[in-house]
Amino acid sequence: MKLVVDASVAVKWFFRDRTDESQMDEALNVLSGVATGAIELIQPPHFVAEVSAVLAREAPEHAQRDLRDLQDILFSIRDDAAVYARAMKLAIQLDHHLFDTLYHAVALETPGAVLVTADRRYLAKAKAEDRVCSLTGSRALISGERP
C-alpha cells in the first residue's frame, strides 16, 4: 500500500509518551506498516523540514536524535512539476496553504497512493477530493476495509 503522511501524523511517532496526543495508536500503526514493508511512504520534498521544525520547537532536548530517527524511516520523495501544479491548484481551490496541499498532491499524482492526515482543518476542506483519509480512518484503510 502506498501512503503519504503529513507532518500532523509523523510528529506523533516522536511524542509517544505524551498523554495529550490523540490518535497515537493509529499513527504507530502506520509507522509499523512502514517498518514491515507493508506500507510504502511517498513524501513531498518539505516533509523532513516540516517535521523537524515541530520537533525542534516541541522537544528540543530530543530533536537531534528524533531527526536521525526520522531520516532512518524509508520513504521516497516526489517533487516533479505535476506535483507542484496539482498542489497549486488545490491551494487555490481549497483556499489552503501550499505546504499542506503538497502532501495531497503527491497522493493524487502517485497511482494508488492515499494521503493520511490528522489535520482536521485540511480534511474538512479536502473531504470532497479523492484519496485523502483521516488518521482515524487509516486503520480500516490499511486493513483493506473502507474507512
Regions found by a protein language model. Name each.
Residues 1-43, 55-65, 129-130, 141-145:
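Short, well-structured N-terminal submotif of metal-dependent ribonuclease cores
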Residues 2, 30, 48, 76-77, ...:
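Acidic, PIN/NYN-like endoribonuclease modules and their adjacent C-terminal/linker elements
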Residues 5, 42-43, 78, 98-101, ...:
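Short beta-strand scaffold positions
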Residues 8, 45, 81, 119-120:
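Alpha-helix N-cap/helix-start capping motif
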Residues 10, 50-54, 69, 86:
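A general alpha-helix detector
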Residues 38-39, 96, 110-112:
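Short, high-confidence coil segments that cap the C-terminus of an alpha-helix
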Residues 43-47, 83, 103:
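Short, conserved alpha-helical segments within structured domains
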Residues 65-94, 105:
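Acidic catalytic patch
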